[in-house]
Amino acid sequence: AVPGDWQAGLVEPDEDASGMVTFDPETQEGFMLIKGLKPNDPRRELYQLWIWDQDREPDPANPSPLADNVHPVDGGVFDVSAEGEAIIPIDAKLVIGKPYLFAVTVERPGGVAKSDKSQVPIIAQPKPDA
């Protein structure tokens, strides 16, 4: 399995959020534990997980997650309740070979096929020894 800890994101970061994510490329199963992420109103917005896969990179030896030609895989949508803690199974829409970055974005109800990454409250990078 590939584990990583959540940290503040790149755009509109959530400094209070914590937790971890783990994903096993062999079984294509994983989950997220998130604490302290701002609750969302499902009628207005939801959270969506994105997974960057080194195997899908144009140049796998030099991954560049912010490049325009790099498209992360949709890992599923979820809500965070007023309790602010959630355990969410990962629902990757495509097979993931070598995940190297996980990010949560804020999107419209129903989710999106491609995020504009205008709100990225938390990210996680797999631990080097994983």
Segments the model singles out, each with a brief description of its role:
Residues 1-130:
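N-terminal targeting/export leaders
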